[in-house]
């Protein structure tokens, strides 16, 4: 695995340049499985009232670099969302039981998480919150030097967007992602949806 030796990635979640929470990934090797756990927690407050919040726990398992298991539980504004995904060897597909999709998925789908550089090669991404599958188009914008916590990194700047015009505006997505090939890390993600959002690397070990 490209992530041998990596123990954790911590990212701040910002909205309109203000830190409102975090998303943290923890990596472990369990015999022949590579296991990634994620904890995400953030909330947007307006005049002291929480108007939007996410509290999420996920676990994904890989065998020989291939996804075999994914499970997530999320509270979005107190509404529960979930995904249970398993690789079914007999049909060579993923079987998903999610809050917004139940059924099969082909193996060219990648979970839409911000630790995994496979997202740049994927034609479809699975929502880690609800299990929905969306086709995506990935474009390389170019090489850019960016500053993260006072340190300069050379990155590849990608744009990832949903390419199904029939999706409602609410379900469409477009992300800009800055990836550092040297240490295989996604350093920064930005998008606009009711504000300017940014996921930014805080630390890794």
Residue ranges and their predicted role:
Residues 1-88, 118-205:
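Acidic, serine/threonine-rich low-complexity disordered tracts
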Residues 70-112:
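Hydrophobic, well-structured mid-protein blocks that either form specific transmembrane helices
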């Amino acid at each position: 695995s490209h992530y041998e030796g990596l123990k954790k990635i911590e990212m701040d979640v910002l909205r309109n340049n203000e830190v409102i929470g975090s998303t943290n990934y923890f990596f472990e090797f369990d015999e022949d499985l590579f296991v990634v756990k994620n904890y995400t927690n953030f909330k947007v407050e307006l005049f002291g009232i929480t108007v939007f919040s996410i509290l999420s726990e996920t676990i994904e398992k890989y065998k020989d670099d291939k996804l075999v298991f994914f499970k997530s539980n999320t509270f979005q504004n107190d509404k529960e969302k979930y995904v249970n995904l398993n690789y079914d060897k007999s049909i060579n597909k993923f079987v998903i039981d999610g809050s917004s999709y139940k059924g099969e998925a082909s193996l060219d789908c990648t979970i839409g998480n911000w630790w995994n550089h496979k997202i740049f090669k994927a034609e479809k991404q699975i929502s880690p919150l609800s299990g929905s599958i969306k086709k995506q188009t990935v474009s390389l914008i170019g090489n850019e030097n960016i500053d993260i916590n006072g340190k300069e990194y050379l990155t590849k700047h990608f744009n990832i967007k949903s390419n199904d015009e029939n999706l409602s505006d609410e379900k469409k997505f477009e992300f800009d992602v800055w990836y550092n090939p040297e240490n295989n890390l996604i350093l920064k993600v930005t998008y606009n949806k009711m504000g300017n959002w940014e996921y930014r690397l805080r630390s890794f070990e």
